[in-house]
């Protein structure tokens, strides 16, 4: 452990795992010289539940309810990457309507996640008002989720080849009304926060990460884009139907806590624009595809409906859908960064390996370096700007 030189005997303080601003069961062993942080050691694992091992003896449909417990504030993204992996592996086509519904749900989930980042982050640095404001909008998003999926959180809505149920009657109009209501609220947050002199004193120049440093540490999401890297998997990987909408990648060059705040505020605007475009141009047709065509078989490119190799995916968890003997890495742009799954099929109904790449775990690695030399009060600002959820960090 490298430590800065100190004037006096250092004091070692344990923050967490139940400190109110620790954002979950994270423990920081902080070495202090007065109010200056000499060193910090994060202790993880308090929320480890063996999610990767559980996946190895569950079918994909049986595993779907588990994945919503990784990042429990952005559950649509964990579901999306969980169904995208077998879809890519078995070459399953997703109907256009299902793809649009997925994009709408993903962006609503991004809004809910960013809102619940903004409130506690502001509370961490001493501003209580936004903490109460964000729940007003978040409640409306959860009402939309509840009417479409039946659940406010842990939706269990995505399925291999589409979604579980179609959007209910009147849902599109209700969601458009929410978008019209929400855009002025983002302006209200900005008027309240962005140019506030006390807020700027707390975040400007704090927790600086340079461009090369961010790339070398493997950061992703707003952490990477706030350091001057225009990298968004929705533009890079062209998954779902994001290419059909007009939107911009939000990024900043400063690399401090203020830049990370501005990126997330900008992303809320862009997400609302994507939702509005998707709702206005959503096509008709089926919302699911229950056909699985096997690929990679000797002598066949893809199985036809009357071939022996043709497979039907049941809506219930059943052993009819086998994962081909291949491996694949699938990723989505979650609110916190790149959420990826490395899936190895073994010609079995169970995956041979299900490796999770959580964004929070990777982004948290840089925390000790950011905290060395700062004041004790800045720990909460820097940790809050990273935006971690311990469910996905510990898995």
Curated annotation (Swiss-Prot):
It comes from the Eukaryota. It is found in: Plastid, Chloroplast thylakoid membrane. One of its GO terms (molecular function) is NAD binding. GO terms for cellular component: chloroplast thylakoid membrane. Its EC number is 7.1.1.-. It is a peripheral membrane protein. The keyword NADP applies. PROSITE patterns: COMPLEX1_49K. Belongs to the complex I 49 kDa subunit family. NDH shuttles electrons from NAD(P)H:plastoquinone, via FMN and iron-sulfur (Fe-S) centers, to quinones in the photosynthetic chain and possibly in a chloroplast respiratory chain. The immediate electron acceptor for the enzyme in this species is believed to be plastoquinone. Couples the redox reaction to proton translocation, and thus conserves the redox energy in a proton gradient. This is NAD(P)H-quinone oxidoreductase subunit H, chloroplastic. It comes from Staurastrum punctulatum (Green alga). The gene is ndhH.
């Amino acid at each position: 452990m490298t430590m800065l030189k100190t004037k006096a005997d250092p004091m070692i303080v344990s923050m967490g795992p139940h400190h109110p601003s620790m954002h979950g069961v994270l423990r920081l062993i902080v070495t202090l010289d007065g109010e200056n942080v000499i060193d910090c050691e994060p202790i993880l694992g308090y929320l480890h539940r063996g999610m990767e091992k559980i996946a190895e003896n569950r079918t994909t449909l049986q595993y779907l309810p588990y994945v919503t417990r990784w990042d429990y504030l952005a559950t649509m993204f964990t579901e999306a990457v969980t169904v995208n992996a077998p879809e890519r592996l078995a070459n399953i086509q997703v109907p256009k309507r299902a793809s649009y519904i997925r994009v709408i749900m993903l962006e609503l989930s991004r809004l809910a996640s960013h809102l619940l980042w903004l409130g506690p982050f502001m509370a961490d640095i001493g501003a209580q008002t936004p903490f109460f404001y964000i729940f007003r909008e978040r409640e409306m998003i959860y009402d939309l989720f509840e009417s479409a999926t039946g659940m406010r959180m842990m939706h269990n809505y995505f399925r291999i080849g589409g979604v579980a149920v179609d959007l209910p009657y009147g849902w599109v109009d209700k969601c458009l009304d929410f978008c019209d209501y929400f855009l002025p609220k983002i302006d209200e947050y900005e008027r309240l926060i962005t140019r506030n002199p006390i807020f700027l004193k707390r975040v400007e120049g704090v927790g600086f990460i340079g461009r090369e440093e961010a790339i070398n540490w493997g950061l992703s999401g707003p952490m990477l884009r706030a350091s001057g890297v225009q990298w968004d998997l929705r533009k890079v990987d062209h998954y779902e139907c994001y290419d059909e909408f007009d939107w911009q990648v939000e990024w900043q060059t400063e690399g401090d806590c203020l830049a990370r705040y501005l990126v997330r505020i900008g992303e809320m605007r862009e997400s609302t624009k994507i939702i509005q475009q998707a709702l206005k141009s959503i096509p008709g047709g089926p919302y699911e595809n229950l056909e699985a065509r096997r690929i990679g078989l000797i002598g066949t490119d893809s199985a036809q409906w009357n071939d022996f190799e043709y497979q039907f995916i049941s809506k219930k968890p059943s052993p009819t859908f086998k994962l081909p003997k291949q491996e694949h890495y699938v990723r989505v742009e979650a609110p916190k960064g790149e959420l990826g799954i490395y899936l190895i099929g073994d010609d079995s109904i169970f995956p041979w390996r299900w490796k999770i790449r959580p964004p929070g775990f990777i982004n948290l690695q840089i925390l000790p370096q950011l905290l060395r030399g700062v004041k004790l009060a800045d720990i909460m600002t820097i940790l809050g700007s990273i935006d971690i959820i311990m469910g996905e960090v510990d898995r």
